[in-house]
C-alpha cells in the first residue's frame, strides 16, 4: 500500500518523522483519516491522539491542539505540544487528570480551561499505553 510522509512539529522542534499508510487525527470537526494522494487541506486540531498506521502496526503521538496540513504526499501536524508515548510521565498525567476533575467539581472555575486540561491528561494517559508497542 502507498505511504505518506508525516511530520509532527511543535515550537520546540520535531516530535515525529516517518511514513504511514494511514494517518488519523482528531480535528475540531471530528476524526480525519488521511492516505497518500489525499486532497490538500488545512484543518484545526482538537486535543487527541494522532495515529500512524503502517504494515498493521500503529504508533501514536499525544497532540494538544494546533493544525494539520495535508498535501498529496505529506501530512504536517503543527501542534502547540506533542508527546510520543515514551516521553509521557504517566504519574504526572494521572495527577493532572485528578486536578482537572477537582476543578470541574468546584463552582468557581473556568470550565472550558478545566475541560481542556482534563482532555489533555486523558489523551496523554491513553497514548502512554502504547509505550513499546
Swiss-Prot record:
Question: Ion transport as a keyword?
Answer: yes
Subcellular location(s) of the protein: Cell membrane
Q: Name one GO molecular function term.
A: proton-transporting ATP synthase activity, rotational mechanism
The yes or no answer to whether the keyword Membrane is present is yes
Record membrane topology? Peripheral membrane protein
Q: Might you report a single GO cellular component term? A: proton-transporting ATP synthase complex
Q: Which SUPFAM superfamilies match?
A: Epsilon subunit of F1F0-ATP synthase C-terminal domain, Epsilon subunit of F1F0-ATP synthase N-terminal domain
Q: Which keywords fit this entry according to its UniProt record?
A: ATP synthesis, Cell membrane, CF(1), Hydrogen ion transport, Ion transport, Membrane, Transport
Q: Where is this region: Disordered?
A: 81-110
Under PANTHER family, the record lists: ATP SYNTHASE DELTA/EPSILON CHAIN (PTHR13822), ATP SYNTHASE EPSILON CHAIN, CHLOROPLASTIC (PTHR13822:SF10)
Q: What does the record give as the function of this protein?
A: Produces ATP from ADP in the presence of a proton gradient across the membrane.
Kindly state the subunit structure of this protein.
F-type ATPases have 2 components, CF(1) - the catalytic core - and CF(0) - the membrane proton channel. CF(1) has five subunits: alpha(3), beta(3), gamma(1), delta(1), epsilon(1). CF(0) has three main subunits: a, b and c.
Protein name in UniProt: ATP synthase epsilon chain
